Every structure is written in C-alpha cells, then in structure tokens.
C-alpha cells in the first residue's frame, strides 16, 4: 500500500493570490507550493482518494492517475470536495463514501454529476480494494466532519481530517497507535476554532502513540518550507509513504 499527499495546503493554498508575505514570496521565487488538501491511497493498481481538492485535475495528471476506484469525503468545505467536478465527462458513477449528513450537504453542489452514493455510519468499517476504512467524528464547527482510519496488512494510518484539538474519547480510541498520523495543523501556534496548530497536533500524536507524524493542511502562517521543516514534521506535496514487509518507507516529491 502507498499513501501520497497530493496537497498539503489549507483552503487558499500557498502561495496565496495577492499575498506578498515572506512565505508566499519564497514559494513564488523558488517554485514550491502547497496545493489544496487531498490524499491518494494506492493498493496494487487501484487508486482511492480521500477528499477531492480544487486542484484535483492537476494532481491526478501529474501523478498519472487515470481512474479512481472510489472517493471518501471528510466534510463539506469547498477545499475538500469541489474538485470532484473534474470527473464530469471523464469518469461516470464514481463511488463516494461518507456519512449521510455529509452526502446531503455536498450533494446540493453536485447535481450536474452522477455518482454512486455509499452512505456509511461513523465507526462502521468498510473495504475498498482490500483496504479497510473507518470514519470517526472530529470537531470542525459548524459542519459535520470525519477523520479516516486506514488499515491494511497490520498497518494503521490515521487521517485527522479538519479538526480542532477537542476530539471526543470514542474517536480518540479509534485513532490510537497508528503507524502514521496525518494531522491537520494550520499554523505553528495560536488558537483556532476549526483547526489544530502544530503544537496541538504534535501533542495529539504523542497521546495516540503514533510511530510517525506528518502535518498537513498547512497555511502560509508557517515560515518557508525549508525553515518550517526544521521546526516541525511538515508534509510536502507528493510526499509518499510505502507500507510493506513490516516497514514504513518514506519518499519525498520532486
């Protein structure tokens, strides 16, 4: 199994349009960026997406993904679902898994496109391409939102999705002891109503007993990537994690 971070940015991405802060200027000058959040899960020749970002067309083209087996949506904010429209006239009847309430919220925007709704309840496991997934509630007010637990061949990966640090105990129990925790962390510090900061995300990783932590959904509040990576385990676009032979292997995008 392979997991790739297709986008590690927050809703406006980095660099932000019309922003001339140090981080955005560094991104323009040096040619790096943070596309909007999406994760690619690969098993054999099958591809599964966790969220469909506004940058999805580019993300799929640049990673030679011609067809996806399924999509999982974590919540109804545009930076996590709006790229699904890229499947229009490209791939019909994509299977989409999420909770009934999230399906209802996103479905209002997707009436031009036919897809197969797969409604799953929180804490109810389901399989796609021999990988087991479980959705669990997180805290991203005011919308309903879920994180994703991924299990394959004894490995466990947890994606927090967008959430603040106030996650309920039942969800925390579901998240325990992951081999890899992909945690949202919009800024290095500060208090945010909808998101964790890096320090909160790192504390969550320690509490869960995560073997490895990578931070995603990162805003331009961080210093430029090279400097930020010396302070925190910040993810980068197209970073890959391979699971096999009892080990986790990590590779970075170009």
Model feature map: region roles:
Residues 1-62, 144-161, 180:
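Conserved beta-strand hairpin/beta-sheet module of binuclear metal-dependent hydrolase folds
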């Amino acid at each position: 199994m392979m997991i790739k971070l297709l986008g590690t940015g927050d809703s406006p991405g980095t660099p932000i349009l019309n922003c001339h802060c140090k981080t955005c200027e560094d991104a323009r000058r040096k040619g790096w960026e943070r596309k909007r959040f999406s994760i690619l899960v690969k098993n054999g020749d099958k591809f599964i997406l966790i969220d469909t970002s506004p940058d999805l067309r580019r993300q799929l083209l640049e990673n030679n993904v011609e067809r996806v087996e399924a999509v999982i949506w974590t919540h109804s904010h545009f930076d996590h679902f709006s790229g699904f429209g890229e499947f229009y006239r490209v791939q019909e009847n994509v299977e989409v898994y999420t909770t009934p309430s999230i399906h209802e919220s996103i479905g209002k925007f997707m009436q031009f496109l036919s897809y197969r709704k797969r409604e799953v309840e929180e804490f109810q496991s389901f399989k796609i391409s021999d990988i087991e997934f479980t959705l669990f509630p997180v805290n991203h007010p005011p919308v309903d939102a879920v994180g994703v637990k991924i299990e394959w061949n004894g490995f466990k990966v947890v994606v927090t999705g967008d959430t603040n640090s106030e996650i309920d105990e039942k969800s925390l129990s579901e998240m325990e002891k992951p081999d890899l925790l992909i945690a949202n962390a919009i800024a290095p510090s500060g208090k945010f109503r909808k998101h964790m900061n890096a320090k909160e995300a790192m504390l969550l990783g320690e509490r869960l007993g995560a073997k490895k932590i990578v931070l995603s959904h990162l805003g331009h509040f961080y210093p430029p990537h090279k400097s930020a990576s010396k302070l925190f385990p910040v993810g980068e676009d197209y970073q890959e994690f391979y699971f096999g032979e009892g080990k986790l292997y990590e590779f970075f995008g170009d």
